[in-house]
């Protein structure tokens, strides 16, 4: 289960007790049942804390998509083309709501990830070396040529 959150206090001042707090939660999992269970547990915990602290809570979903599994054959072809270039491969789940997640419902889909320095992703310090970007683009081009040639 991947979990990310943020808290925004209003007013956000050192010496003032806030009168409003906005808490966002981003839950991700490749297993729909586990995702639903986590959502229910978070909602129950928030309701319990709100009742014990006698505060009001408003909860709403900003976005919700069922997890998808990418096309196994296409993922295998991505791995084949990476290995042909002596590149390492690793299968990684991603619940970030990429376009590929939406397209998988319509057609076979896969994603190609390239390494970020220090593993930082979706972070202001994220950086990927040019050579890794070129390698990822080469894998994509080789796959596209293969698919175009049928």
Protein language model annotation of sequence segments:
Residues 1-2:
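Short, small-residue-biased leader/transition segments that mark boundaries at the very start
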Residues 9, 28-32, 62-66, 119-131:
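Short beta-alpha connecting loops at secondary-structure transitions
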Residues 10-15:
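Short beta-strand/turn micro-motifs at beta-sheet edges
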Residues 34-38:
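Solvent-exposed, non-transmembrane alpha-helical starts
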Residues 39-44, 114-150:
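His/Asp/Glu-rich mid-to-C-terminal helical/loop segments that flank catalytic regions of hydrolases
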Residues 41-53, 77-85, 139-147:
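Generic non-transmembrane alpha-helical segments
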Residues 56, 60-115:
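Active-site-adjacent substrate-binding region
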């Amino acid at each position: 289960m991947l979990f990310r959150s943020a808290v925004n206090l209003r007013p956000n001042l050192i010496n003032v007790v806030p009168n409003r707090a906005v808490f966002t939660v981003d839950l991700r999992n490749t297993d729909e049942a586990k995702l639903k269970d986590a959502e229910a547990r978070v909602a129950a915990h928030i309701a319990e804390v709100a009742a014990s602290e006698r505060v009001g809570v408003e909860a709403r979903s900003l976005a919700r998509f069922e997890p998808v599994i990418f096309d196994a054959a296409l993922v295998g072809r991505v791995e084949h083309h990476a290995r042909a270039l002596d590149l390492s491969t690793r299968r990684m789940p991603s619940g970030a709501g990429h376009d590929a997640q939406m397209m998988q419902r319509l057609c076979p889909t896969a994603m190609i990830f390239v390494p970020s320095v220090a593993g930082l992703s979706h972070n202001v310090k994220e950086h990927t070396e040019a050579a890794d970007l070129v390698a990822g683009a080469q894998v994509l081009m080789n796959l596209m040529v293969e698919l175009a040639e049928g």
